[in-house]
Regions:
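Mid/C-terminal beta-alpha module of Rossmann-like enzyme folds, strongest
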Residues: 198-283
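A short glycine-rich, His/Asp/Glu-containing loop-to-beta-strand
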Residues: 276-316, 322
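NAD(P)H-binding glycine-rich loop region in Rossmannoid oxidoreductase-like domains
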Residues: 43-86, 90-94, 107-114
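Conserved Rossmann-fold NAD(P)-dependent oxidoreductase catalytic core, especially the SDR/UDP-sugar
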Residues: 85-127, 134-137, 141-142
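Conserved beta-loop-beta element that borders a ligand/cofactor-binding pocket
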Residues: 128-153, 173-182, 217
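Conserved C-terminal "lid"/linker of ANL adenylate-forming enzymes
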Residues: 346-398
Length: 398
């Protein structure tokens, strides 16, 4: 299958082309038997000769090209309607009946605050043109009205509030929120890309629109992405400030699986400058060794690193309503538990395997763990180095 993507260097186009090329090269293996042979990437630096050639060969078209922030309103119609006409005329010239997807906007509803939107009018004109083209030529046309988009590679200070907030907060720049109670419906770029690939496989989601409201319908003229989220500006900014403060608080906010918070955190990280990808941790040192907190959580306690010098015994205490788990990753020593109130029931644990020790209401002792290094402990936003340490020390992993 050969795919033509117009607007390939824009926010949506770049993300879509990246995944399409992953499928083409076999890096993305989660789409069944979908096979992509070529991805034609058309943008402002492409030629009309290239467009003509690609329109003659392609098996599917993603039309993402458009104008969002022109210098004058007339450019909306030229950029959004004019190019659409050129694209469809070129496909028609070659008799190419490949399915065509159109990227439109919620503003094309021309309702509510979008009633006088020049951008919305140009998008609505493009929709009508595509739908008419489909009816007249027997071509499958997929018109998507996207809400507010966000995700990696989205340009800040352009047309995405989330991109601007992420960029400014990550880079210590001020932000402006006129009304924190304003609610946005937002669509994450990876969810959009998944829907585009579903459309490529003939599994798109159809609907009708009642104003801005999506009405799912198998026979609907329009299409939509089924996974969106709603959040107020205040909620978005509050989450971003929590992400920003993590190096100081070490507190990981609640990030449920498949949540808006998870998507927003991934987006925020993509705007971090290089010098913030790593940060120092506070290393509490004394004659016994050191203790360093790594992360705190709201519901699951904290994670820390404890380094003991040779011959040192730590512990010798117990908790009423707290439990601890120890994972020994380097060195050697003896961990013991004794049942409170008796000298009996002393438990020894294996010394030469990577193990996890659960500590209930027992006194525990930790002996003979040597120092593994010196200087500041730093936390990386990378995978854990434990496996590397194991291999270097010849420690068996169980």
């Amino acid at each position: 299958m050969k795919i033509l993507v117009t607007g390939a260097k824009g926010f949506v186009g770049r993300n879509l082309c990246s995944q399409l090329n992953n499928i083409k090269t076999g890096k993305a293996k989660c789409y069944g038997d979908l096979q992509i042979d070529e991805v034609f990437e058309y943008d402002l630096d492409s030629t009309m000769e290239q467009l003509d050639a690609w329109c003659s060969e392609c098996d599917f078209v993603f039309n993402l090209a458009g104008v969002n922030r022109p210098q004058n309103p007339e450019e909306f119609m030229t950029g959004n309607f004019g190019f659409a006409s050129t694209l469809l005329d070129t496909l028609k010239k070659h008799g190419n009946k490949a399915p065509v997807m159109l990227s439109s906007s919620a503003q094309a509803s021309l309702t509510g605050r979008f009633g006088n939107s020049e951008y919305g009018r140009s998008k609505k004109a493009g929709e009508d043109l595509f739908l008419q083209y489909g009816e007249e030529n027997g071509v499958k046309v997929l018109v998507y009205r996207f809400p507010n988009l966000y995700g990696k590679w989205c340009r800040p200070n352009y047309n995405s509030a989330i991109a601007t907030f992420c960029n400014n907060i990550a880079n210590e720049l001020p932000i402006t929120v006129n009304d924190p109670k304003v609610e946005l419906e937002v669509l994450y770029i990876d969810d959009l890309v998944e829907e585009m690939i579903a459309a490529l496989k003939g599994q798109e989601h159809h609907c009708e629109f009642e104003g801005l409201t999506v009405l799912p319908s198998a026979e609907g003229r329009y299409c939509y992405c089924p996974v969106t989220h709603k959040a107020t500006l205040g909620e978005i900014v509050d989450l971003l400030h929590q992400f920003h403060d993590m190096p100081k608080t070490l507190m990981i906010p609640e990030i449920p699986a498949d949540s808006f918070a998870k998507r927003l955190y991934s987006t925020y990280l993509s705007y971090l400058p290089k010098d913030k990808a790593i940060f120092d941790l506070k290393m509490n040192c004394d004659d016994r060794g050191s203790f360093t907190e790594l992360v705190h959580t709201l519901n699951c306690g904290q994670v820390s690193i404890n380094i003991s010098k040779p011959g040192i015994t730590k512990g010798q205490h117990w908790h009423h309503t707290k439990w601890e788990q120890f994972i020994v990753v380097s060195g050697h020593g003896l961990i013991q538990q004794r049942k409170e109130g008796t000298d009996e029931d002393v438990r020894d644990f294996c010394r030469n395997k990577i193990s996890r020790y659960k500590i209930p209401k027992y006194i525990f002792f930790v002996d003979e763990f040597p120092m593994t290094g010196s200087g500041k402990i730093q936390k990386f936003r990378l995978k854990d180095l434990g496996l590397k340490l194991c291999k270097e020390q010849g420690i068996e992993i169980i």
